[in-house]
Structure formats: structure tokens, C-alpha cells
Regions:
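Acidic carboxylate-rich catalytic motifs and surrounding loops in phosphoryl-/glycosyl-chemistry enzymes
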Residues: 78-85, 243-251, 333-334
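A donor-sugar binding/catalytic signature common to diverse glycosyltransferases
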Residues: 65, 289-334
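Boundary detector for helix-to-coil junctions that initiate low-complexity/charged tails
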Residues: 1-11
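Structural motif
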Residues: 193-194, 243, 303
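Short, aromatic/basic amphipathic alpha-helical patches
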Residues: 91-100, 252-263, 318-320
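Conserved aromatic-histidine-acidic binding/catalytic patches
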Residues: 49-59, 220, 242-245, 285, ...
């Protein structure tokens, strides 16, 4: 997604004001939750409900953590409504902070809510300017933490800036099934490991995502795969005998790279979480579980590498996985 500045950014904000009106009306029209919320003060709800484009898993976490940081600074009650294309509680549970919606807290009634749609906005200005006394439904796919920290943890405030990983771990811990898979995967690897992440974004034709087109050329596909395999071998020579975990969005590539001695992969299929539900085959629970498993396994590596050609996508997924426990991260262009 492009990042806008100046007049273009102001136009984006204006466009989003109209989007907010449309969302408010559309959601209320089909909602069965229109009662007056039973809360002492308005709650702030991070929305992942399928009513707008949310992005992939990492983009969703960016928006969630941004709103949580804002609420934590100001003492606002924070909740998450994550229902698309699955319920977040199927994979993650509340850790130190309970973000789950309680009976009677939530409403879609326009009399009691204010939709704040900030998809693509890299500044938290409109969030700072909120004066609403209504329940806030927040849509965002950007990491606003730096801007929020600079605003509320200025020198002289006595506040320290928040760390992305600490906020994530305050909110989330793996559910029972996810935790079991994490332990089983770590046992399979057998010790410390480092990780390499490759994001082909459908270049190899096996990961439908939005309108990204495959190469559709067997020779070019093989050239790209070989280049990435060579990068893996170069990386392994640098790290000696330590195990290497490789994650990617292409099953073609994972099948090839798994043939290299010392490389570990996480079995299973992948799908993009936003708008790709019709491409998800087989057991959907297992398919989405793999994304969470990849994320948590990356977060516990000794170091995470993002590797790709200029044509490949420089995903933020490994960047934020590394942020969870503040482990070293390096991006390599080949």
C-alpha cells in the first residue's frame, strides 16, 4: 500500500470520512446488535469483521496494537472484535489484558458508535483528535506506535515509550492447540534455530492474493526458485550446524527447500487472510493455524532473515515476528 503525504494525505483522510459514514450505515442496516451499550464509559474496539479490507495477519496486528497503545496511555477500555475469516479466540487467548467483548458491551447502533476508518493512514492524528463520547469502532492496518509514543511519552511526561512486543504479549498468548503445535515444532527442530522468510506473493502461481499475477513462465519460475535456494545455502554456510527454519507463502518453494539437509519447514497450506476465503481448501482451521504457528516460531528464532529479489514482496510479517521478543532481524536482497 502506498504512503501518502501532504495534500494526498489530506484527501485520503477526507475520503475516509465518507467511508466511515458508509460503513456505519451498512453495518447497522444488517446488524442484530443495536441496543444501548451497557458500559460505564465508551469502549474502543479494534475491528476485524470483514466489512472492509484488513490486510494480512501482520497488518491486522499493527492496527490492534496501535489502538491498544493509545487506550493504555489514556486509560480507555480496549476490546477486539475479530470475526473474519475466523474468531481470533480460536487461536489466541487474552494474556495480561482481557480484550474480549462482554455481553451487552457492543453495539452497531449509529446513535452510540463512531466508526474511525484509518486504513493506510500512517499518522495517528485523527485518533488523537477524537472527542467522541460514543463507542469507537477502529479500522486500521498501519503501525502507529511510533507516533503514539512520541505524543504521549514526551520528555517530561514521566511516561516511557511502549515496545511493540511487550504490548503484543500483554494482549495475546497461544491457545491450547496453537501452543501444542509450537511445542511439537520446536521438539522436531531439536534445539536453537534461526529463520529465513521468503514472500513470493503468487509469483510462482500457488498463492492467490488480491490481483497479483504469477510469472506464468516455467523458466523464470525455476530461475527465481534457484536464486532463492542458493541464498539459503549461502546463509547456512554462515551459520554452521545450527538448524534453519524456512517459511514462505509458496508450497512449490517449500517443497524444494525442504530437500536441503538442515532445513526445517512447517507442514501445511497457507492462504491470505483478507479476501481469499474462496481459495482456502480443506481444513480451514488448520490453514489459518499455520500462519499463527509460523509467526510464533519466527518470534522464537535466534535471528530472523527476510530474503528476496527486488521483484518479491518485502513483507512486514518477519519484522513484527522479530519484534515480539526483540530478536535480531536482517533483510537481504538477492
Amino acid at each position: 500500500m502506498a504512503t501518502y503525504y501532504g495534500k494526498k494525505y489530506k484527501l485520503l483522510e477526507l475520503k475516509h470520512l465518507f467511508k466511515e459514514l458508509l460503513l456505519t450505515t451498512k453495518i447497522a442496516f444488517k446488524s442484530k446488535e443495536l441496543g444501548k451499550p451497557k458500559t460505564k464509559s465508551p469502549i474502543y474496539v479494534a475491528m476485524i469483521d470483514g466489512e472492509a479490507y484488513h490486510g494480512g495477519m501482520c497488518d491486522r496486528f499493527k492496527g490492534i496494537i496501535s489502538l491498544y497503545a493509545y487506550c493504555k496511555y489514556l486509560g480507555k477500555p480496549f476490546r477486539i472484535k475479530y470475526t473474519y475469516p475466523f474468531k481470533l479466540e480460536d487461536y489466541l487467548q487474552p494474556a495480561a489484558y482481557d480484550w474480549t467483548l462482554k455481553r451487552g458491551e457492543y453495539t452497531d447502533n449509529p446513535l452510540y458508535i463512531r466508526v474511525l476508518y484509518m486504513r493506510g493512514e500512517h499518522l495517528a492524528t485523527r485518533l488523537f483528535n477524537l472527542r467522541a463520547k460514543r463507542q469507537i469502532h477502529f479500522y486500521s492496518n498501519r503501525d502507529l506506535l511510533e507516533h503514539i509514543n512520541k505524543t504521549y511519552a514526551k520528555e517530561g511526561t514521566g511516561r516511557r515509550p511502549f515496545n511493540w512486543g511487550e504490548l503484543f504479549c500483554e494482549l495475546f498468548k497461544p491457545g491450547t492447540i496453537l501452543q501444542e503445535r509450537i511445542e511439537a515444532t520446536k521438539e522436531s527442530i531439536g534445539g536453537d534455530y534461526y529463520a529465513a522468510v521468503f514472500r513470493f506473493q503468487n509469483l510462482l502461481g500457488d498463492f492467490p492474493e488480491y490481483r497479483y499475477r504469477p510469472l506464468n513462465d516455467k523458466d523464470k519460475e525455476e530461475e527465481l526458485i534457484t536464486k532463492c535456494l542458493d541464498a539459503v545455502k549461502t546463509l547456512m554456510a554462515k551459520h554452521g550446524n545450527m538448524a534453519l527454519l524456512v517459511t514462505a507463502d509458496s508450497m512449490k518453494f517449500l517443497k524444494r527447500v525442504s530437500q536441503i539437509d538442515g532445513v526445517h519447514i512447517i507442514p501445511g497450506t497457507l492462504t491470505h487472510m483478507d479476501g481469499q476465503k474462496h481459495h482456502t481448501q480443506g481444513n480451514q482451521f488448520e490453514t489459518y493455524l499455520k500462519s499463527f504457528l509460523d509467526f510464533y516460531m519466527l518470534s522464537e528464532a535466534q535471528k530472523v532473515y527476510r530474503i528476496g529479489t527486488p521483484q518479491m514482496y518485502h513483507s512486514a510479517f518477519p519484522v513484527f515476528a522479530a519484534k515480539m521478543h526483540d530478536i535480531p532481524f536482517e533483510s537481504i536482497t538477492i
